[in-house]
Amino acid sequence: MNMLPDIETLETAAEGGSHPLFADVPSSVEFNKLRKRLLRLTRQAIEDFSMVEPGQRWLVALSGGKDSYGLLALLLDLKWRGLLPVELLACNLDQGQPNFPKHILPDYLNANGIAHRIEYQDTYSVVTNKLPEGSTYCSLCSRLRRGHLYRIAREEGCSALVLGHHREDILETFFMNLFHGGRLAAMPPKLLNDEGDVMVLRPLSYCAEIDLEKFAAAMRFPIIPCDLCGSQEGLQRNAMKAMLEDIEKRMPGRKDTMIRALSNTRPSHLLDRKLFDFAALNQTLITGQDASDDI
């Protein structure tokens, strides 16, 4: 069901009023274009992947990084304009990382009148106890965080957990799976958790990381560093990021092309027998039926 207005309506709305969070943002043409583009792409992902059911409550994960701040701001802007008929609850999970500035997020959320929940769970100690010194903590830390966020979503009556992954996150995951996992899989824009009671949504799936960086700078979000624990993301993801940046530099626009390709698959032109019945082609040949598939 189409729950959101068309793009023309959205673009007209983007020129009008907005959430108080945007009260002191730049009035430049450049920023207005950036905001409009991010709103349009966020709305497009929400519509394309049927994320909205009226009356829902969404738990918006807020880490303090540029992506989650941008996600929250764009969703609040859409809701302020009457374009997102859901209730939003921001949530930060303080995982006990060393030197985590506990005051920044509550101060920011309270100052802007944003409904939120802050919860402390010392997953940092769990990770450091389980993994040898020098290991990359990000994967285990993320899994533990996700489990707590699912629990909080249930406790708060939220049917969806909303995450700030963007276009580059999806492409990097695709190539990590391709090169290191031997499978064609990316990061889904919409996923039901294993228990079947919380939907995971990624409304920024079409948004470019560089746009979110510019947006965060213009909005003056109080960014919290993601490396407080001293660990860095694995070399595999960093290598994929560097590869994609090199491709984009040499052939501008390829990232957008790759994202479009992920929604334009041809199972008959791959090698997965679970997706396409190659054996049925023998019967088709005998009966003379047309089984062509855009060769």
Swiss-Prot record:
Biological or metabolic pathway of the protein: tRNA modification
Disulfide bond sites: none
Keywords for this protein: 4Fe-4S, ATP-binding, Cytoplasm, Iron, Iron-sulfur, Magnesium, Metal-binding, Nucleotide-binding, RNA-binding, Transferase, tRNA processing, tRNA-binding
Pfam families per record: ATP_bind_3
Cofactor details (free text): Binds 1 [4Fe-4S] cluster per subunit. The cluster is chelated by three Cys residues, the fourth Fe has a free coordination site that may bind a sulfur atom transferred from the persulfide of IscS.
Binding site for [4Fe-4S] cluster: C138, C141, C229
InterPro entries from the UniProt entry: Rossmann-like_a/b/a_fold, TilS/TtcA_N, tRNA_Cyd_32_2_STrfase, tRNA_thiolation_TtcA_Ctu1
GO biological process, one term: tRNA thio-modification
Biological role stated in the UniProt entry: Catalyzes the ATP-dependent 2-thiolation of cytidine in position 32 of tRNA, to form 2-thiocytidine (s(2)C32). The sulfur atoms are provided by the cysteine/cysteine desulfurase (IscS) system.
Family that this chain belongs to: Belongs to the TtcA family.
Additional observations: The thiolation reaction likely consists of two steps: a first activation step by ATP to form an adenylated intermediate of the target base of tRNA, and a second nucleophilic substitution step of the sulfur (S) atom supplied by the hydrosulfide attached to the Fe-S cluster.
Protein name in UniProt: tRNA-cytidine(32) 2-sulfurtransferase
Name of the coding gene: ttcA
